[in-house]
């Protein structure tokens, strides 16, 4: 079975599934790194302990989504013709997921979709993911929902199962962040991810720490040698509830994103990566362009006026952060309000095994402790 990811959040959701499949030994997973920047996805799979079996290089400019999609279609076609998989598993609504689903359909290979978004009525929100998801839905044989109105492990409809978010089982590698993730899951702490290169974000974070005793901040994007160049950063890094994450340590960043209440950045790529991880995010209009180092799927097609940017002053950023922390519908809410459930990856494996005729029921039951719902 091919597990195809086109972004780091997609890799983070599929890596635990690959591990569960290998552990149970009845479905042979082959992880595939694709998308506009496949090496970034490749590195994410490796950092998460699941080295990709295949890395698909588009061979075209990664800033043109249409050309990337066309190149991926040819390469995925060759891959499926060579591998002849029993099924293809995709996550989210990126361009790689869209093309993988279409090519699998052309090859008459069942598509399994791990759907991590909310059901919305606006085709253009988020863009282009929502449109991509609707196309994928028409080609999908088995829907696996990370969240929904149904109860975990209950079949929500024909070939539709709520399994939980596989990202929630991911833990940071660093001991301090791993401890923070554990406390966040227990409801005794909340975490926020801040771009350490934006002074208004740092100032707002400093104020928020003083008024929110259960909040801890993870600063991303600056090395320890850069700290002394920014007085606000100097003060924050000495705070007992502040953690400095140098550059982009993938395992730590995705692991802490799995439990974070909000994120704030001035980079479009980090903004959308946070949103794809289910983290409510704030995009600050710092005037630096905000493009970031890595394009996300569809960036060249996006009307940037659609993104609700926050003014680059500490007061506006603080107001936006406080709003997310106090809004349960945004996913932050009071400590302990965000649900975390173990075993999602094994529920995905079980559902796939059922689709392939290896299980009688689509969801595990309490008689099988290795695969049962908690």
Predicted regions span which residues?
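An aromatic- and histidine-rich active-site surface loop
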Residues: 89-107
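A donor-sugar binding/catalytic signature common to diverse glycosyltransferases
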Residues: 89-91, 113-114, 143, 249-296
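A nucleotide-sugar donor-handling region in carbohydrate enzymes
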Residues: 32-34, 38-39, 138-199
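A short, histidine- and acid-enriched strand-loop-helix "catalytic/donor-clamping" loop
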Residues: 112-127
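Catalytic binding pocket for nucleotide-activated donors in carbohydrate/polymer assembly enzymes
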Residues: 272, 276-327
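C-terminal amphipathic helix plus adjacent low-complexity
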Residues: 167, 174-179, 318-319, 326-374
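Donor-nucleotide binding loops and adjacent catalytic segments primarily
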Residues: 42-45, 176, 181-262
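Glycosyltransferase specificity loop/lid
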Residues: 1-83
